[in-house]
Amino acid sequence: KNIEYLLRMLGNICGVEDLAITTNGIYLKNYVKALKESGLFRLNISLDSLDDSKFEKITRGGKLKDVLDGVEEVLNLGFKNTKINVVAMKGINDDEFEEFAKLTLERDLEVRFIEYMAMNKENLASEDKYIPMADIIDIIEKNNELIVQPIPMLGSGAAKIYKIKGAMGKLGFVSA
């Protein structure tokens, strides 16, 4: 609630040159115009599946269409450096990596694949979801020519950046 007000306040702080947020995107379409008007520069959108039923299960009831509609609205409003963050999980979304990569063909966005990591002792059993970044790249390269990109100064973090030959957008790969 009132995030637009908070963003305006943060944007008015002397020296703030970049303002970005990460969202699950569920309500993004409803707020994206106000976010843009409040001075937000960049958006990172967490999206771990492009399959309706998997998405609903992962998010415990979220609707994929709501997030995808929000992404399109973000692009229509001219946000730059929009990123889709995908946590890569073996047996859950590993059959969707190429479909995610294809989102960059006609959209100026960056799809980032992030290696799955167990966060505590209780999650060690879920290490079976881990997929090495090299395997993710291999899956995408089977049907696409990937071109290494120079890393931009702003907002690149630890990602290795690639582009499918001829694509508008980019692919980022973040190792755990």
Where in the sequence are the language-model features?
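A short, surface-exposed helix-loop junction/capping segment
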Residues: 115-120
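Beta-strand scaffold of nucleotide-dependent catalytic cores
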Residues: 112-114, 174
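Radical SAM/AdoMet-radical enzyme domain recognition
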Residues: 2-112
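Accessory C-terminal segments flanking Radical SAM cores
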Residues: 121-176
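Alpha-helix initiation and capping sites
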Residues: 94, 105, 113, 130-134, ...
